[in-house]
C-alpha cells in the first residue's frame, strides 16, 4: 500500500524543449492547462510502504493510471503529457532509518522512461556516494536519447516549490 499525502491543483506553465548544445526553447501551448498533482506518502506507522525500486515505481504508476482512467479524471496519455510522473529519489544505507538527499526527475513520459529514469538515478546516487561525493538536492531531467538524468536546477529550500494552500478550500481527509 502506497499512501497519498495530498492531491492539489496547479496550472501548467509551459514546456521546455532542450535542443542541441545548451539551447532550450519554450512551448507555451499548454500554458494555463489545469493539473492535478498527487503526492505519495511513506508512513510505516499508518501502514503505507515506500517505493523501493524502479520496478515498484513503474507498477505503482500503472495501477494509479488504471484508477484515474476508471474515475474518468484523466485520459492517461503519458506521451501527450496528460499523465506525468516526477519521482523523487533518495537512497539510504541498508538498515538505516534515514533517507539521504532527494532529487526529483522531470520529463518521464512513459512507463519505460519511469523505470529507466528511476533505475538510473538510484545507480547514479549510489555511485556518487561510493566515490565519496555528495548527492545534491536538485531537479534533474530525463534525457531519453542518452539514457541519463541531467541537472536542471538546485533546490535549496522546500519553499522553492511555491506551494500555497488555497484559503477558501478546507483540507479533507479520506479513509
Stretches with model-predicted labels:
Residues 1-175:
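Basic, nucleic-acid-interacting segments
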Amino acid at each position: 500500500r502506497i499512501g497519498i499525502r495530498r492531491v492539489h491543483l496547479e496550472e501548467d506553465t509551459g514546456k521546455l524543449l532542450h535542443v542541441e548544445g545548451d539551447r532550450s526553447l519554450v512551448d507555451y501551448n499548454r500554458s494555463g492547462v489545469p493539473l492535478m498533482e498527487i503526492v505519495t506518502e511513506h508512513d510505516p506507522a499508518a501502514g503505507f510502504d515506500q517505493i523501493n525500486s524502479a520496478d515498484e515505481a513503474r507498477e505503482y504508476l500503472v495501477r494509479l493510471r488504471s484508477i484515474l482512467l476508471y474515475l474518468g479524471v484523466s485520459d492517461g496519455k503519458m506521451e501527450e503529457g496528460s499523465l506525468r510522473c516526477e519521482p523523487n529519489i533518495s537512497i539510504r544505507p541498508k538498515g538505516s532509518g534515514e533517507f539521504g538527499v532527494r532529487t526529483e526527475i522531470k520529463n518521464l513520459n512513459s512507463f519505460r522512461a519511469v523505470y529507466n529514469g528511476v533505475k538510473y538515478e538510484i545507480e547514479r546516487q549510489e555511485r556518487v556516494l561510493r566515490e565519496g561525493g555528495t548527492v545534491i538536492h536538485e531537479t534533474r531531467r530525463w534525457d531519453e536519447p542518452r539514457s541519463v538524468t541531467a541537472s536542471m536546477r538546485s533546490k535549496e529550500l522546500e519553499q522553492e516549490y511555491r506551494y500555497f494552500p488555497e484559503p477558501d478550500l478546507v483540507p479533507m481527509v479520506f479513509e
